[in-house]
Amino acid sequence: MSNQSLSSKILGGNLVLRIAVGLVLGICLALVSPDAAKSVGVLGQFFVKSLRAIAPILVFVLVMASIANKEVGSDSRLKPILVMYVLGTFVAAVTAVILSYLFPTTLELVTSPEGLAPPQGVGEVLKTVVFNLVDNPLGAITNGNFIGILAWSIGLGIALRHAAPSTKVMLNDISDAVSFVVKVVIAFAPIGVFGLVAETMATNGADAFIGYARLLAVLLGAMAIVAFILNPLLVYWKIRRNPYPLTITCLRESGVTAFFTRSSAANIPVNMGLAKRLGIKEEIYSIAIPLGANINMAGAAITITVLTLAAAYTQGIVPDFSTAVLLSIVASICACGASGVAGGSLLLIPLACSLFNIPNDVAAQVIGVGFIIGVIQDSAETALNSSTDVLFTAAVSMSDEKNN
């Protein structure tokens, strides 16, 4: 009973509110006493180091368990929905790349390594990816080689699809255990944000927050373009009539709820209720909605892409178009692994950053920046992710009814 009480105290409460309080307190301390603000920077450094420690094992276990246990139905009616999910996520990543090119954003990081060697075009990037793919799995986890981690987790996940049910249950249990550790780490985000903001403000001044505001504007701009322009275009492609009544309904009845719950998984019952009211067959939405909560991650793809390119620009790296397209693909794949994990999209940023040879300590600092703006970013990301689940499911269902 005492353990439950302790867990509830650590993990309970409104995380968004606590992060906002940490943000404000960090700014106030930096303004009142810059020296003290630099001293509490150790709290932010400890938080970032915790994120660096948990990210490799999180990616490895989560992807492996997800693939090993994934049971996608053979019903052909799900295939068009899956196509919409994948296409929507990729289009979102490409949109984020374009906006990042139009409005390049740099960040004020606490430290930045000297002598960083950026990759020379997509050829070098692909060479790095291929060599990282065949890294020793233990070495990949130890050294934070996320490409190698992803390769091994996918390979083992595919192999374990044929394992005994008890093995799959064990994988799920391990995945749940790692996710719990992640939740504990994320629960200390307000303290970490307090330290990061205080040290950044004391070291770099108010200019740091101009970069944060610009970054947030690019993120929200990309999400708005996807929600109000590109998603309706994809829906029109399926139903061949005005897509906005359906789009607005999904944003109002699903997106608003998801904005405040900040959890696609928690919003599944809301989406199922909306799908039922829209007249979608239960045998379709009962599978498509939970599946979408796991793999339909347009908002996460935008977050990963924008923050990765911000990290690249901060290090003086300007990716060429081919590398940016590769990033869009990687971000789309990463986004599918972000579901069900607090701060999941942020914790997968190091994987995308590895395309540009950006060190893990820089990527971890970018994760910290993500938590600073996460009060708004995470809510908007979840609203886009979750509302799109029911939007695409409804669009495909309406298209099938029209054709039949």
UniProtKB/Swiss-Prot annotation:
This is Serine/threonine transporter SstT. It catalyses: L-serine(in) + Na(+)(in) = L-serine(out) + Na(+)(out); L-threonine(in) + Na(+)(in) = L-threonine(out) + Na(+)(out). Involved in the import of serine and threonine into the cell, with the concomitant import of sodium (symport system). The gene is sstT. GO terms for molecular function: neutral L-amino acid:sodium symporter activity. It comes from Glaesserella parasuis serovar 5 (strain SH0165). One of its GO terms (cellular component) is plasma membrane. The chain crosses the membrane at residues 10-30, 53-73, 81-101, 140-160, 177-197, 215-235, 287-307, 329-349. It is a multi-pass membrane protein. It is found in: Cell inner membrane. InterPro entries: Na-dicarboxylate_symporter, Na:dicarbo_symporter_sf, Ser_Thr_transp_SstT. Keywords: Amino-acid transport, Cell inner membrane, Cell membrane, Membrane, Symport, Transmembrane, Transmembrane helix, Transport. The keyword Cell cycle does not apply. Belongs to the dicarboxylate/amino acid:cation symporter (DAACS) (TC 2.A.23) family. It holds the Pfam family SDF. One of its GO terms (biological process) is serine transport. The keyword Transmembrane helix applies. It comes from the Bacteria.
